[in-house]
Amino acid sequence: MSEKERGTELSEEEKAELQKTEKGTVIELLVPLDTYLSAGVHIGTHTCTRYMERFIYRVRPEGLYVLDVRKIDERLRVAAKFISRFRPEAVLTVASRPYAFTPVQKFSEVVRGKEISGRFPPGTLTNPYLDNYIEPEVLIVTDPRTDLQAIKEASKVGIPIVAFTDTDARVDFIDVIIPANNKGRKSLALLYWVLARQILRERKEIPLDGDIPLRVEDFETRLTE
């Protein structure tokens, strides 16, 4: 375990707190709390923008920001409900971070959407004369910092944007924020797996307690030797 991961370990009291609302009502998370924590979805950075302050659970003594798992779970539900309103084939997901390539590809396979992994070709959403021009109804980005070209184009033509945002994110032009560790390999796999499953639940393609045929591990980008 890295120093960063050690710094985000939670006490039993904190774990109990994260499974209840501020009024003390027990929350049923989309996956068990320990599953979220072991994937590191709550691990932030040493920087926090004012846009992300409302999603912070605590700040470690060394200055590392830790995200509130309850709010991650809540925003995954909000995003899934929002995305489910659009035609499956009109959902475009992009990722320029290598660790996000497999999660995005598997996610798009499950929800039957389109995806662009790697470099986002300029004009994809704005230049109808290009062969690769597409007209999605909603855009999902893995990281506003690295997927900026896609965000600029979507905002220019009025496409709503859903984004995974870490503590250091700027959220200009983002319509639906999912606060989360959008850099970690295991975190990205779990986030996209949960989002895919919840979208199918919202579409009523699977029961409210149903699962998808792929495992979280199937969404994980493999490390090269």
From Swiss-Prot:
CDD domains documented for this protein: RPS2 (cd01425)
GO cellular component: small ribosomal subunit
GO-annotated biological processes: translation
Domain of life: Archaea
A GO term, aspect molecular function: structural constituent of ribosome
Claim: Ribonucleoprotein is one of the keywords in the record: yes
The keyword Ribosomal protein is annotated on this UniProt entry: yes
Keywords recorded for this protein, A-Z: Ribonucleoprotein, Ribosomal protein
Disulfide-linked positions: none
Family that this chain belongs to: Belongs to the universal ribosomal protein uS2 family.
Protein name: Small ribosomal subunit protein uS2
